């Protein structure tokens, strides 16, 4: 039984050895040493002493066995030589070194002394030719892969970046048998690399040469293989690429380069985040972490775009418990599933369904779980929809905020952070006006909380603040997903007005700054924190760049159609009202707007009247709101 098992094991190993390659190696080794002997005697066979011919016949079998065994031990018969590179070359060197040690051992065993040149020339030739035949196979494979006729090529590719990521992309294109594509040229900002080659592909110039090279090689696809470049640099290169009619794709990020997953299948189309060119926001992670750690955190609207990202970033900071509260069970379920998969039992995660309009539900949750921090993200945010359903904006946004804030005071919550919007500044729509009322509510509640604590002789009170920012990319109400769908459908791409501008920020950026602002709120309670959204973006320009970077020409392949401003929409957004002033913080991306003085008692009376009007579906709700928010002038 053991004999059969041993035989089976040997046969299995033999199966992994290329017999044909081993025979070829044997012939090369025998020929190399014989050739070395002929060189020693000036290619006159008759001059060779019989001692040397007999010695050659005696040792060559040993040399062949030793070389073949070494090549096998270093897996050179198992390598896929079509993809051979430095790794295989290094292993060939190791195999040759150990083989030469074997040659020395054979000499001491047999005591057959051959000419010194026999060992040197024979050894070098055997290494050179056994290695050469392997890399010749690779060269022939590359020639075969790149022997596709230009007529058969569908994608004519330019790679931007001559670094590791660029090389990986080029190699994959070269070795792929299924892609009808070819990399024609590379560009890199390092001028020293120009006129050099990567795997036979010429580095033709720098970023300024992209348009000319695209025309020269009839390029229809540009790949950005510069994951470690600053966002600003990537944006500048994209600006150049957008002047061509090429489709532009990019590697997702430097992580793919670090973990070795740079691949054609991981390429993605250029997104608006790339066009913004914003570098990563700076936040004090240690201070934020200490602020969140071991606290019970409640996130209302925790399944929404902002709320779910708040949950993700809070979960990273080791809270005592994280409570996801949302009226939409589907949204809450998906973020719950994501966080459970990532953190398992290490995160105390509670997912609850309910409405911020239901005071009893809020009381029961706060009574049971006793949150330390509340991030209030639950809100209706869609401007045109709220114009048609203004009473719902009041019920959910305004009264919902009042309910959560009131419950927070009564249940001794330490910090309350409202997620607001720049549409609350001089609002032209009911959604923005409702969010301005929310800001006024939390400023009133901050004063109330402070006053109640003083009356009771307490130093601890609920500190309220709001964080105001503009449009976030990827949110449910963002225009960007609409643009993408319209481009995929062949157009038209609809823009409300040629001159409309907006501030944009990614959701993770916005939430990171929200958490930083929440930390500052320990000192600046009652204030509105305003996030720096960078430079404003012209929506028309953004739409046209997205079309170009998708490989189409605006107004030729895909129409850009202007539909007119929607109800409640304005051409530009503002960050602060004049009366709020502007105070800087240690984080240059966060500023502070101070509360505008108001009569809290009068405001409460107005709130009660507003609630009654909304609950009775008053047709005059917008006019009532305008009496409370003087800068809001309804259009109808």
What are these regions (language model features)?
Residues 265-269, 273, 277-370, 581:
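N-terminal Rossmann/SDR dinucleotide-binding element
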Residues 30, 34, 38, 57, ...:
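A solvent-exposed beta-alpha-beta segment
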Residues 2, 234-296, 409:
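Flexible, Lys/Arg-rich cytosolic regulatory linkers and terminal tails that connect or flank
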Residues 1-153, 157, 178-181, 194, ...:
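Signature of alpha-helical transmembrane segments in polytopic membrane proteins
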Residues 282, 287-291, 444-636:
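Strand-loop microenvironment adjacent to phosphate/nucleotide-handling motifs in alpha/beta enzyme folds
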Residues 214, 218-220, 319-320, 366, ...:
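Proline-aspartate-enriched helix->loop->beta-strand connector
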Residues 260, 376, 382-383, 387-439, ...:
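Conserved Rossmann-fold NAD(P)-dependent oxidoreductase catalytic core, especially the SDR/UDP-sugar
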Residues 235-251, 321-328, 373, 388-415:
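NAD(P)-cofactor binding segment of oxidoreductase domains
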């Amino acid at each position: 039984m053991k004999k059969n098992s041993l035989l089976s094991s040997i046969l299995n190993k033999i199966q992994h050895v290329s017999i044909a390659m081993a025979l070829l190696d044997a012939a090369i080794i025998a020929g190399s040493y014989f050739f070395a002997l002929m060189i020693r005697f000036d290619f006159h066979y008759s001059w060779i002493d019989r001692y040397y011919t007999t010695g050659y016949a005696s040792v060559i079998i040993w040399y062949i066995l030793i070389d073949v065994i070494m090549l096998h031990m270093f897996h050179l018969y198992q390598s896929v030589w079509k993809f051979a590179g430095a790794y295989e070359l290094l292993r060939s060197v190791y195999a040759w070194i150990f083989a030469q040690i074997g040659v020395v051992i054979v000499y001491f065993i047999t005591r057959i002394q051959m000419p010194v040149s026999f060992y040197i020339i024979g050894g070098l030739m055997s290494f050179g030719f056994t290695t050469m035949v392997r890399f010749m196979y690779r060269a022939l494979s590359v020639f075969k892969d790149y022997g596709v006729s230009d007529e058969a090529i569908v994608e004519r590719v330019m790679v931007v970046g001559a670094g590791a990521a660029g090389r990986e992309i080029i190699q994959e294109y070269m070795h792929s048998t299924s892609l009808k594509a070819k990399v024609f040229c590379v560009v890199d900002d390092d001028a020293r690399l120009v006129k050099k080659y990567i795997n036979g592909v010429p580095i033709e110039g720098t970023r300024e040469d992209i348009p000319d090279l695209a025309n020269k090689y009839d390029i229809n696809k540009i790949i950005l293989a510069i994951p470690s470049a600053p966002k600003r640099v990537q944006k500048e290169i994209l600006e150049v690429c957008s002047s061509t009619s090429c489709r532009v794709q990019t590697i997702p990020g430097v992580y793919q380069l670090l973990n070795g997953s740079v691949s054609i299948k991981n390429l993605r189309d250029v997104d608006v985040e790339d066009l913004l060119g914003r570098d990563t926001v700076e936040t004090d992670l240690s201070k934020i972490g200490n602020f969140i750690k071991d606290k019970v955190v409640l996130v209302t609207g925790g399944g929404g775009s902002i709320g779910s990202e708040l949950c993700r970033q809070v979960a990273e900071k080791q809270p005592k418990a994280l409570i996801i509260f949302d009226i939409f069970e589907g949204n809450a379920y998906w973020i719950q599933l994501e966080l459970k998969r990532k953190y398992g039992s290490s995160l105390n995660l509670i997912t609850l369904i309910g409405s911020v309009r239901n005071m009893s539900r809020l009381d029961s949750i706060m009574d049971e779980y006793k949150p330390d921090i509340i991030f209030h993200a639950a809100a209706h945010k869609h401007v045109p929809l709220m114009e048609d359903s203004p009473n719902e904006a009041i019920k959910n946004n305004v009264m919902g905020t009042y309910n959560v804030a009131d419950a927070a005071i009564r249940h001794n919550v330490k910090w309350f952070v409202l997620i607001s919007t720049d549409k609350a500044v001089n609002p032209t729509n009911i959604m923005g006006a409702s969010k301005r009322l929310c800001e006024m509510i939390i400023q009133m509640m901050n004063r109330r909380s402070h006053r109640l604590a003083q009356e009771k002789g307490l130093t601890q009170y609920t500190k309220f603040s709001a964080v105001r920012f503009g449009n976030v990319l990827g949110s449910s109400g963002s225009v960007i997903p609409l643009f993408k769908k319209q481009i995929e459908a062949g157009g038209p791409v609809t823009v409300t007005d040629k001159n409309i501008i907006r501030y944009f920020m990614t959701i993770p950026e916005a939430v990171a700054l929200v958490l930083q602002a929440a930390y500052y709120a320990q000192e600046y309670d009652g204030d509105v924190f305003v996030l720096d959204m960078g430079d404003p973006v012209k929506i028309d320009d953004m739409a046209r760049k997205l079309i170009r970077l998708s490989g189409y020409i605006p107004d030729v392949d895909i129409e850009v159609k202007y539909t007119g401003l929607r109800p409640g929409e304005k051409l530009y957004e503002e960050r602060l009202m004049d009366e709020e002033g502007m105070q800087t913080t240690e984080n240059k991306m966060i500023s502070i707007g101070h509360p505008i003085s108001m009569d809290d008692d009068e405001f409460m009376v107005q709130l009660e009247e507003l609630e009654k009007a909304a609950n009775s579906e008053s047709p005059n709700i917008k006019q009532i709101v305008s009496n409370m928010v003087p800068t809001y002038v309804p259009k109808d």
